[in-house]
Regions:
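N-terminal non-catalytic cap/leader segment that marks the start of a structured domain
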Residues: 1-104, 273
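Catalytic-pocket segment enriched in acidic/His residues
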Residues: 8-10, 63-65, 71, 92, ...
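Residues embedded in well-ordered beta-strands
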Residues: 14, 136-140, 161, 209
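Structural signature of FAD isoalloxazine-binding scaffolds in flavoprotein oxidoreductases
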Residues: 100-117, 131-133, 267-278
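A structural-propensity feature for long, helix-poor, extended segments
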Residues: 116-138
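Short helix-loop capping/hinge motifs at secondary-structure junctions, enriched
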Residues: 145-148, 199-201
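N-terminal accessory regions of nucleic-acid-interacting proteins
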Residues: 146-160
């Protein structure tokens, strides 16, 4: 299933996306949220309830809406935790002038940074010069879990989506920890929907591409990860409990703006488009902070 959170007619609800391909302006959405008003209006809340089958009970009779007629929202508006991994592609390690880490580099993005498709990524007034994009595969946890083995890790995954780990590079590098450079409001675009795990045969063989204003900047595969999704889940859950709806952004490949010569960071007026095979497209305009 492709589970979307969307707004139409002044209300936000859940739906099932069909026949969309990679685009978010073609295809339809089955309006299960209207057909069953008892459904949660957030994918994270639905996952916490432990019953995804509720979505299918009214799918056969629910109305269908054109995707172009609705506003897609972040699938999980307030994840319990938004974790991210740094330096998880060797080519990005190299372009950053760093050495391969001995263990996964883990940091938090504050959940207030989450936005959805089409929402504006703000260039902060206080830090306008080094605002960068990072196209990433997002893994979403579906089951409360702790001490998960690598072998069992697939069983705790609800699905996948696209994440743009927007980064304010000068703030990121000002301190040993990255949270302040990674958590500005609007700097966590996610979407365009959650693709359930059963639809992705291998999350470690997906093409990932990022464009800025039509220029291809990142073109890689998730097979290039240093620490794969299952290993990351095992590592993280050794230390702390993972809750349903937790987002894990698994790192970005080479091609980020700060590493270009001259630098190619985002500016107000830019558009960033990220596409991951089988997951769709996440596109956001870049705007000045109001």
């Amino acid at each position: 299933m492709k589970i979307a959170r969307f707004t139409e007619g002044g209300t936000t609800r859940l739906g099932l996306v069909v026949a969309a391909g990679a685009a978010t302006d073609t295809g339809e959405i089955i309006d299960v949220g209207s057909a069953d008003p008892s459904l949660p209006t957030d994918v994270g809340v639905l996952l916490a309830s432990g019953d995804l089958t509720r979505l299918g009970r009214t799918a056969g009779t629910a109305a269908r809406l054109a995707l172009s007629a609705v506003k897609l929202e972040a699938p999980i508006a307030q994840p319990p935790t938004f974790l991210a991994i740094g330096l998880n592609y060797a080519d990005h390690v190299a372009e950053s002038g760093m050495t391969k880490p001995a263990a996964p580099v883990v940091f938090n993005k504050q959940i207030t940074c989450v936005i959805g498709p089409g929402d504006g990524v703000e260039i902060p007034t206080a830090a306008p010069d080094w605002v960068d994009y990072e196209g990433e595969l997002g893994v979403v946890i579906g089951t409360r879990c702790r001490n998960v083995s690598v072998a069992d890790a697939p069983s705790v995954v609800a699905g996948y989506m696209i994440v743009n780990d927007v980064s304010v590079r000068d703030w990121q590098r000002a301190t040993p920890t990255m949270t302040m450079g990674k958590s500005w409001d609007t700097h966590g675009p996610t979407g365009p929907w959650l693709v359930t795990a059963d639809e992705i045969a291998d999350p470690h063989d997906l093409g990932i591409r990022t464009w800025v204003d039509g220029e291809l900047r990142q073109d890689a595969s998730t097979k290039q990860m240093i620490t794969n999704c299952w290993e990351l889940i095992a590592h993280l859950s050794t230390a702390f409990t993972l809750l349903p709806g937790t987002i894990i952004a698994t790192g970005t490949p080479a091609g980020v703006g700060f590493a270009m010569d001259p630098p190619g960071c985002m500016k107000a007026g830019s558009t960033v488009r990220i596409e991951i095979d089988q997951l769709g497209v996440l596109e956001n305009p870049v705007i000045a902070q109001p």
